[in-house]
């Protein structure tokens, strides 16, 4: 046929059997990739420390999606929470992976069958014997089935009626676990961070889909609408399908990047806005102040802070810090976190408590500046020591640690104080193992960043694909060089005498 590479799909344009075959093969590839990728991730995943070495630090991509849907156990005897399990059941990580690979094989065989047996009676109009597809009817069937699936997922899987539920956590992502979720039918259901909204929206959207599907199965489209939207053209189906996909891709890119109940921090890592707004830092300060007010010492108060919460307040876990072209997981950047050193508090020689100005997201380097409670500069690490006025040495700055590995220790020598000031600029201080993975010290992004970038990019490409195929189907006659006038002249039944405009038939009024 001699088609260029970008036009090869023309061969299935008027061949429903082989169109089904290529879609089956595509689904087989997707399911096979998902299962294979899951097995690979399970093989390289280290479940030993879910607090300081969680899945999102290790670059896991499909694992978080499995966990949020209720899969937490492995046939290897471990769980996502770092515990041991004796009976993981079939629906473990490996079980789901095997099911996908098995499904992939069946779809592969189905694709081959449909490619060989392409000319089925099903694709022919029983009245004329000509190849024909009833696209509005097919639309109704697909809408009904997808509505049924959507409703079933919300009403059974998520509610725990017949399924595990979904991943639910507190506002600071400390106590996350899989549990059944009740639907939220009030205004609170529109809060993107409320898991109940996910349930109610699936149930509601499913009901709408079922009703809409039944409507389209029982009501034929008006002739004018059918013609205006080119409902008889398979490229219309392609165009509208692409629009549904790019719209969904834009939505999930947003919910992933800005955060939502469906993209929990424990599974995908923090968002950049939680660093920008000092979300976790403020919560730690609130907890400490509350404990101190209740009579606890600073050391006791900071020791009650979970290491998990402290680790979220570290810039290396900010997905916007990793460049898009820096390959590898976060652990390949700053290393594998081993321990929290504690909360660093700085003081100058006059006894003023100082805090290090935190590095903004989009800076690779930033001056180390120590300010007092009023925001006044009191000390820094100067660029040019000869002209310095506020150096650590000149201001007699010391650092004390509360909580963590260095709890109760105070350092007064300038080089050590500077070291911890540089660490404090990046949030809470942690000790990292950079040897095991040969980590290079350059920050990487989490799965949150990769997912967002990928889906936003493909959504944009698919948007243009929608315009392209929509334009082709709407203006097919123009692109083919056949004007409306010519079409009318040769169309059977438009005139009493073919091509004679003076014999136009009157439409039935």
Swiss-Prot record:
Transmembrane residue ranges: 21-36, 101-115, 140-156, 203-218, 237-252, 457-472
InterPro entries given in the database record: PS_antenna-like, PS_II_antenna-like_sf, PSII_PsbB
Listed NCBIfam families: PS_II_CP47
The keyword Membrane appears for this protein: yes
Assembly, per entry: PSII is composed of 1 copy each of membrane proteins PsbA, PsbB, PsbC, PsbD, PsbE, PsbF, PsbH, PsbI, PsbJ, PsbK, PsbL, PsbM, PsbT, PsbX, PsbY, PsbZ, Psb30/Ycf12, at least 3 peripheral proteins of the oxygen-evolving complex and a large number of cofactors. It forms dimeric complexes.
Places the protein is found: Plastid, Cyanelle thylakoid membrane
Leader sequence residues: none
Cofactor note: Binds multiple chlorophylls. PSII binds additional chlorophylls, carotenoids and specific lipids.
Principal location class: plastid
Keywords assigned: Chlorophyll, Chromophore, Cyanelle, Membrane, Photosynthesis, Photosystem II, Plastid, Thylakoid, Transmembrane, Transmembrane helix
Example of a GO MF term: chlorophyll binding
Gene of this entry: psbB
Protein name: Photosystem II CP47 reaction center protein
Family in the record: Belongs to the PsbB/PsbC family. PsbB subfamily.
Function recorded in the entry: One of the components of the core complex of photosystem II (PSII). It binds chlorophyll and helps catalyze the primary light-induced photochemical processes of PSII. PSII is a light-driven water:plastoquinone oxidoreductase, using light energy to abstract electrons from H(2)O, generating O(2) and a proton gradient subsequently used for ATP formation.
One Gene Ontology cellular component: cyanelle thylakoid membrane
Biological source species: Cyanophora paradoxa
BP-aspect Gene Ontology terms: photosynthetic electron transport in photosystem II
Bilayer topology term: Multi-pass membrane protein
